[in-house]
Amino acid sequence: MPTAAAAKSTAAKSTPPTSNQKIAHARAAEPVLVKGRREFFKYRDLGVDQASEGAMRAQVMMASQGMSRPTGWHYHECEGQFIYMMKGWVDLQFEDGRTIRVEEGDSLYIPGYLRHNEIRTSDTMEILEVSVPGKMGTTPCEPPPGFKD
């Protein structure tokens, strides 16, 4: 009489659905720098946009000097944006009136189309940024009521 373990090993095995997505492995020793949406950052592409066929984008944003002025109110055309602060800090204002400082080791999720404004940063900064989908537009907008640009 077969044991439960033997019966389990002979059970039909599931076949996963197929996907054209690929593995992305970005080596720190061979960074791929790309043009980004802000001139005061350097952007390191992590290969996720291409590997996921545009489903997601991951990059590291690096600054070697603090912001001289706020970015201005804007929103991103995406489902969502996630950041993880690897080094330094950034202060962000949100349309609901909150100002949040994201410091080293902190993370923040920003829903798509939520108005916000980066107002200050540390002198050096590195942020892992992930967006869904990979293509994320940035649209300048008017400040929410009660805020100045």
Model-derived segments and spans:
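A short, N-terminal "cap"/entry segment at the start of jelly-roll beta-barrel domains
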Residues: 1-65, 140-149
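A short beta-loop-beta micro-motif enriched in histidine and acidic residues
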Residues: 51-56, 66-82, 96
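A short hydrophobic beta-strand segment most commonly corresponding to one strand
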Residues: 56-60, 107-109, 122-141
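Short, conserved beta-strand element in jelly-roll/cupin
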Residues: 60-64, 75-92, 130-133
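Conserved catalytic-core motifs of eukaryotic protein kinase domains, centered on the activation segment
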Residues: 95-97, 120-121
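Short acidic-glycine-tyrosine-enriched beta hairpin
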Residues: 96-113
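Short, surface-exposed secondary-structure boundary micro-motifs
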Residues: 113-114, 119
